Regions:
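Extracellular/periplasmic, surface-exposed regions of secreted and cell-surface proteins
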Residues: 1-60, 71-368
Length: 368
């Protein structure tokens, strides 16, 4: 039995008259391409397309809820549809050449793109005359109607060169040029370089055979790199307006979100110094010291003074952090006999995090 004011719930009526149906359709297609050019050039590329459509139909019968017919939960019908697609591609050109037996050169150029779009609509009505009339079009009153759409694009261009001399010295350099539509229009593109070098000491002529039996491998490496981070979301930097009912007798809107044209990338600079050793063909030792500093930290939903006309910023660049420390790892092959092997490993680390510059809104935010 269903109560007149919704005090009771009728599971039988829900099972027989109510429904919640979802249909999902996914499609994915990928095309790859390969071609070997003259002069040691190789081309590799792929394009991938992904599409998804989802439809949801729901009906909440009044016979199950027992509410009055003027309630929003009386014969409530909902239809919702969403469509999304993404298109990705990667194009890579490689060059690999050995000169004079000791000089090796590898160059790589990569171009990546990503684009995604999605739309969704939903409408809900209530007060349908009968549980047999479950389409929202038949509803006597609108419970809600929503629609949304978003679009995002990214592009990355990467160039890398690696030089190897006699397997003793390795030098590499990389440049990343990135663009992201979620950034402010004044800082949509950024460039981040990196470089590194390595010295295989055990391949030097002064590394005697006797010493090589004790220290089988020895390498020194160093690197310096800059990287960037963009905000999540499709278009949070856009300004937005929202309805506020009426002003006097006319419809009214107000600015609800500030435009962020000057939003910047969160940038990180990191350098690393490392050592790799292998002793007696059993013990591997890896030592690393790193120093990292992050500036223009991205903070989300930052509260600001109400005198600005806004309650918060969707994103803000403020503050900086430093992170430095030391890591050590040891791997020892206890047993290496035919198909049997036993390895024991241990590691130790010390990490120091420090807030170099406090966020500008520190006194306004509630930190716990």
């Amino acid at each position: 039995m269903s109560g007149s004011k919704g005090n009771h719930f009728n599971p039988v009526a829900m099972a027989e008259l109510g429904f919640n149906k979802t249909n999902v359709r996914d499609e994915k297609m990928t095309v790859t391409m390969e071609y070997d050019f003259p002069f040691d050039l190789r081309f590799r590329g792929w394009v991938s397309l992904y599409m998804k459509t989802q439809k949801n139909n729901k009906f909440l019968p009044q016979a199950a809820t027992g509410v009055l017919m003027n309630s929003i939960y009386a014969n409530q019908a909902t239809d919702a549809t969403s469509d999304a697609y993404s298109l990705q591609s990667e194009w890579k050109l490689l060059y690999n050449k050995v000169f004079g037996e000791k000089h090796g050169l590898t160059a790589t150029g990569v171009f990546r793109t990503y684009q995604s779009e999605s739309t969704s609509t939903s409408n809900s009505t209530y007060g349908n005359a009968s549980a047999n009339l479950s389409d929202p079009v038949i509803g006597s009153a609108v419970a809600g109607a929503n629609s949304a759409s978003n679009e995002r694009r990214t592009v990355t261009l990467t160039g890398q060169v690696v030089y190897n001399y006699d397997s003793r010295y390795v030098l590499n350099g990389t440049i990343n040029y990135e663009g992201n539509s979620s950034m402010g229009r004044n800082n949509r593109f950024a460039t981040y370089p990196s470089c590194g070098l390595a010295w295989n000491i055990d391949r030097e002529h002064f590394w005697s055979d006797g010493f090589h039996k004790v220290v089988n491998e020895a390498k020194v490496r160093a690197s310096l790199a800059w990287t960037g981070k963009s905000p999540s979301g499709a278009s949070d930097y856009y300004g937005a307006f929202q309805s506020m009912g009426t002003y006097v007798t006319n419809p009214a809107i107000y600015p609800s979100r500030m435009q962020l044209d000057k939003l910047k990338w969160e940038s990180t600079r990191e350098w690393d110094l490392g050592f790799d050793f292998r002793f007696f063909n059993r013990l591997n030792v890896t030592l690393d010291y790193y120093d990292k500093k992050t500036t223009d930290l991205l903070s989300r939903n930052v509260e600001i003074s109400s005198t600005t006309g806004y309650a918060k910023l969707s994103w803000m660049n403020s503050g900086s952090l430093s992170n430095k420390g030391f890591e050590a790892r040891f791997d020892y092959d206890v047993i290496k006999r035919g198909p049997w092997s036993l390895r024991v490993n241990a590691n130790a680390s010390r990490n120091i995090n420090k807030v170099e510059v406090l966020p500008a809104n520190y006194t306004q935010e509630k930190y716990t």
